[in-house]
A protein has these predicted regions:
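Bacterial N-terminal signal peptides
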Residues: 9-18
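Short coil/turn segments at helix-helix junctions and helix-capping linkers
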Residues: 139-140, 217-221
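Bacterial N-terminal signal peptides that target proteins for export
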Residues: 1-9
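Extended hydrophobic secondary-structure segments
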Residues: 136, 144-145
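Short, solvent-exposed mixed-charge patches
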Residues: 23, 235-236
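Amphipathic alpha-helical scaffolding segments comprising HEAT/armadillo-like alpha-solenoid repeats
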Residues: 31-51, 73-102, 125-137, 158-174, ...
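Structural detector for internal amphipathic alpha-helices that build alpha-solenoid repeat scaffolds
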Residues: 28-38, 53, 57-77, 103-106, ...
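Boundary at the C-terminal end of the N-terminal hydrophobic targeting segment
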Residues: 19-24, 29
Length: 236
């Protein structure tokens, strides 16, 4: 499982790097490497990337706070793809990408992953959607998976029911007699938002099945009742 997750994370990071806009400079025919692309970015972005690569949670949190401020101010501009790359890296820190010293994992920072996941939903790119799906399906921490589900709902991208399918798959493989209430509620909210955003409502039977399962699971009454409420909304 760890090897599969590592491979998946590596592929996603490669795709993210490609999304940074590797193109041949006019008239030279030479393709820029990833590092050359980053050297063309602002000094601030280069520093932020190095902070993301740091080995301690405090430094990673500092760059996340910086990015959160930029998003709040609406100043990402043409740097959106580079910021997404940094957030994707941090959202998979310790889950899809594991670093060990001996037998001990040294990069398990669930709070960092949760915050990075939250911010990915605010970047609003196709790549951020793909990264959120990967986090939803690969992370072991319920609070991180819950944040990924909520962010996917907020993002609202669901072409060909791709996101709905990922959410339904996540529900199908959970033991709903022992799952987390916050996770389940976030899943319900995500389905609700997809239903509201879809013209004519969400038309995906697996989503209905997922909500029925949650409504019958061992969750708080608030969670089960919310699942029933969303099912009623879908009937209308």
């Amino acid at each position: 499982m760890t090897t599969a997750r590592t491979i998946a994370a590596t592929l996603l990071l490669i795709l993210a790097a490609a999304a940074l806009g590797a193109q041949s400079p006019q008239g030279t025919g030479k393709e820029l490497t990833v590092e050359e692309q980053w050297l063309q970015r602002s000094i601030a972005l280069q520093i932020m990337r190095e902070q993301a690569y740091a080995s301690d949670a405090d430094t990673k949190t500092a760059v996340l706070n910086d990015i959160a401020g930029r998003i709040a101010k609406g100043t990402l501009g043409g740097d959106r793809d580079a910021v997404e790359y940094i957030l994707e890296y941090l959202a998979m820190e310790g889950s899809s990408r594991v670093v060990r010293e001996g037998l001990r994992q040294v990069n398990n920072f669930p709070m960092v992953r949760r915050q990075a996941t939250e911010l990915l939903g605010k970047v609003r790119t196709e790549q951020s959607k793909n990264a959120l799906i990967a986090v939803l399906l690969n992370d072991d921490e319920y609070m991180v998976k819950a944040q990924a589900a909520y962010a996917l709902g907020e993002l609202g991208m669901n072409e060909n029911n791709e996101v709905a399918a990922a959410l339904a798959f996540a529900v199908s493989r959970e033991d709903l007699t022992r799952s987390d209430n916050n996770w389940a509620y976030a899943m319900v909210l995500a389905f609700e938002k997809l239903n509201r955003n879809a013209p004519g409502g969400l038309k995906y039977p697996e989503a209905y099945k997922s909500l029925i399962k949650i409504s019958q699971g061992s969750f708080l009454a608030t969670v089960r009742q919310k699942a029933v409420q969303v099912l009623d909304q879908m009937k209308q």
